[in-house]
Amino acid sequence: MLVKTFCAAVNGLDVNTVTCEVSMSRGVQFHLTGLADTAVKESYDRIKAALINNGFKMPTMDITINLSPADIKKEGSGYDLPLAIGILAANGKVEDGNLDKYMLVGELGLDGHLQPIRGALPIAIRARKEKFKGLIVPQQNIREAAVVNNLEVYGMETLLDVIHFLNGTTTYQPTIIDTRKEFYEQQNHFDLDFSDVKGQESVKRALEVAAAGGHNLIMIGPPGSGKSMLAKRLPSILPPLSLAESLETTQIHSVAGKISRDTSLISQRPFRAPHHTISQVALVGGGNNPQPGEISLAHNGVLFLDEMPELPRSVLEVLRQPLEDRKISISRAKYSVEYPCSFMLVASMNPCPCGYYGDPTHNCVCTPGQIQRYMNKISGPLLDRIDIHCEIQAVPFSELSQMQPGEPSATIRERVIAARKIQEERFKSFKGIHCNAMMSEKMLHEFAEPDAASMDMLRMAMERLKLSARAYSRILKVARTIADLAGSEKVESMHIAEAIGYRNLDRGDWAERGI
């Protein structure tokens, strides 16, 4: 007897429907074909134990299972459930009349309980696209899978629940969650606020400009000056996620297994802050079973690299291409996947190894050679891709104790959203362009062309600071954002002047340190 069940194979963010063909004949052997990895091949032992522990006997017959299409690699333990149901149906224990209506995914515990799988959301999207009536997933994955409309999604606790449902002996209702309502309710709830930070108004302004235009930013200052504190509050002034952005972000986190049981759609922009010991693979993605890295988990959000020069230079250099292309292609001998990675890079660093170069309250103990080697850890090409360089100084306690609370994030966010709306209107006819940081060279001439006085100022800065052509483009993009925040249609000299001021690492004694 031949029985077919349906499941899915996840490759990057792409999902392929997989047909599990189960055939039984005389004999006692078990055959599994279809480019299955080790975890899938081990499913026989899990299925056998689960069946026995739930009152079933493993058929004493020759079982042949083919996972079609056979040229797509099948990875992970999510095939346990469709394989088990296929074996039971071929043995007459499960009615096969409904098997073509549902997609099944789930890992089996030895006691028959269903364990969560990765990629439930993109699998649900695929099931709807293939016009399946419903999707059966482990209960732990129900909230993310139920995000998809026009698809009946059932969360099951055990193998027996699935058997009773397919046989019609027990009635289950599909899970319906008002995910959109939850999404909008949770968008504006932040634990951290800019009003917590006293002083540092110039840095807050730089962060506001960065948020308004989607610009990359680096903060340079001594220990304890508030670099990390300010960076962690950046998401509170970023514009809210759209539903489309949230869906894409949630899919990436779903594939990576980062979605908790209580989460449906990710409602706030991601903030990822990996440790400086991170490897290349962990940062950009990859591995034997390809997984998204930190740059993809930060998609539509912020990637914060604290103490940036402490990261190995080889790790930092892999950021250059993703920062330009806003996507990462990972190619290995056995696979090739692509993940989106449109993120804001926010970095912090000390001015020298001891941290106190230029600090009026501490003496720097570093030699010029040590300072130069420290600064050279960040290459010029990478630094060119960072639009805003912001110097930060520690606030003296005498001033700190007398200052009033700063401007709240909600007020700053209103200005950022207003600037982003101007940019959305400007770029509405350009596919994939949402903010000023994404502008091409051609678009700069159209939307950020400075007047004669501004061009003279910019030419002088280029010559004196020895700026690259890429730095020139970054200045124009930042100036366009500053003009948007001011509600100005044209880029004026005051906007250019402020943008040039955000090239701290290209100026004066900074440049002499070796960058």
Show which residues each predicted segment covers:
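Peripheral, non-AAA+ core regions of ATP-driven protein-machinery
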Residues: 1-218, 222-228, 331, 471-472, ...
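Short beta-strand elements
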Residues: 18-24, 283, 387-390
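Basic, amphipathic alpha-helical bundle interface domains used for macromolecular binding and assembly
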Residues: 33, 39-44, 59, 66-76, ...
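Residues immediately C-terminal
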Residues: 110, 303-304, 310-311
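Conserved alpha-helical scaffold flanking the Walker A/P-loop in AAA+ ATPase domains
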Residues: 208, 265, 270, 280-303, ...
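Walker A/P-loop
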Residues: 219-260
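The Walker A (P-loop) glycine that initiates the GxxxxGKT/S ATP-binding motif of P-loop NTPases
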Residues: 221, 285, 307
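Walker B catalytic acidic pair
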Residues: 300, 306-307, 318
